[in-house]
Amino acid sequence: MTKFIEKPTAITPNRELQSDEYFNETDHLIYCSKCNTPRQCRHELQGKVLIPSIRCKCQQEIFEQEEAHRKLHEKQMEIEHLKTSGLQDKALYDYTFARDNGINPEIKLAHNYVSNWEEMKANASGLLIWGDVGTGKSFFAGCIANALLEKGVPVLMTNFSRILNTLTGMHFEDRNQFINRLNRYSLLIIDDLGIERNSDFALEQVFNVIDSRYRSKKPLIITTNLTLSELNNAADIAHKRIYDRILERCIPVRINNRNIRQDNATANLKQAKKILLNNHAPNQN
């Protein structure tokens, strides 16, 4: 009796091969011809064999690179949004550690505050930055603001004049909502305490802002031209209750007496004078 030997059925790929792929005859999966790792895997589910597509090694590397770029872009957009919201004066963008000229040794305390931010935040520890006019208090605070914003921390740096201008004319409920919005920021920095108008309304609103921040248990940084003695020995109850709240939560930091603003102005004038003296007037024909 004649026996017929059946020719084995050839196993073929379950989809069309791309130009950079080949079919592995051993495990019957499609492979990448560049990295020689599979682009398919085999799973058995309820008695059926499934062969889904997967990323080979080089595809996975490209995917991870693209994902890293996407996350970086999202982070940059988030930081830009935080800066737009938190830095209400464009000049504040330049108040960074990278632009520090080393004149104020106290700037190391700003570095330390940023480095220990999580602990400062947990303890609701703020700073009271005080000193004479033009000594770099706003720059000190701005460096902290920008450094934390770069880390993705929501920071608002503003001043009481701006706050009071916003609150003026608002109804009671609207004022409360505005003050509550200030507390959404992880760090609130208020520049130039003491230069705002000294009316009963202004003092009441300044207290409301400080007291609300105090009760929120979130850090507050204040800059002021007032001396520590003036803050500790307020002239009246209205000022005392404001200053007491600040001194309870904010570590005093004195910025030295050198007038950096005046030094910068003098340097700019010297540079302008040098330009004028070194450039000859054009010939008049």
Regions found by a protein language model. Give the residues of each.
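Pre-Walker A (pre-P-loop) alpha-helix and adjacent loop at the N terminus of AAA/AAA+ ATPase modules
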Residues: 87-91, 96-127
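A short, basic N-terminal segment
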Residues: 1-101, 265-285
